[in-house]
Amino acid sequence: MSQVTMRDMLKAGCHFGHQTRYWNPKMGRYIFGARNKIHIINLEKTLPMFNEALSFVEKLAAGKNKILFVGTKRSAGRLVREEAARCSMPYVDHRWLGGMLTNYKTIRASIKRLRELETQSQDGTFAKLTKKEALMRTRDLEKLERSLGGIKDMGGLPDAMFVIDVDHERIAISEANKLGIPVIGVVDTNSSPEGVDYIIPGNDDAIRAVQLYLGSVADAVLRGRQNAGTGDEFIEEVAASEAAEG
């Protein structure tokens, strides 16, 4: 398992927290000190916690489990979409719709509608409609794609959730908590770590830091899948050679 290093985190600026006046006392144990009224996160505490979270992700991926990537603030959305797509995991990058997990039955119906509209847009149905009706359906399709496009292939509730800014995604976390879905989350000095099972204390705003978290989690997913594949192939090879010998 390849691990994130202290140097990786320092280069990405993961140690810069928020202004001291905005701190959350629950994050006190992860704060090293302050510089120019900015809290500095103790990366000696973050590093093992981050690597523990990555190890958990790798194990989940090896077991063919689904991890939902969540990051809906503007600075994180594009990276969430790209990294989740790179490792073929579901994601929410635009807006968390209340009930996305706790009312999944309704969400599933909306996904079905999204698929119907996708088919209609490709099979010539839109071309047969009036201009107004075609425009309305196109708008519906775009709206559904923006909200649900990242989870349309999820096929059921995820086995874990990875969150970039825990304050921004508090509704998503509370839904996961209600359903017993483990939460991995980047928690900055102004946020509460409550409801997060795998806490990664770190800067949740700097683009380079966000890229490091997402890229590392996506890499852990790909590694886990690869290891699972290697294991299966090895077992099959052993079974085949034993059969040949028998």
Swiss-Prot record:
GO CC annotation: cytosolic small ribosomal subunit
Q: Which Pfam families match?
A: Ribosomal_S2
Q: Which GO terms describe its biological process?
A: translation
This protein's record includes keyword Transcription? no
Under the heading InterPro entries, the entry gives:
Ribosomal_uS2, Ribosomal_uS2_bac/mit/plastid, Ribosomal_uS2_CS, Ribosomal_uS2_flav_dom_sf
Q: Which keywords describe this protein according to UniProt?
A: Ribonucleoprotein, Ribosomal protein
Concerning its family, UniProt says:
Belongs to the universal ribosomal protein uS2 family.
Q: What is this protein called?
A: Small ribosomal subunit protein uS2
- Which gene underlies this protein? rpsB
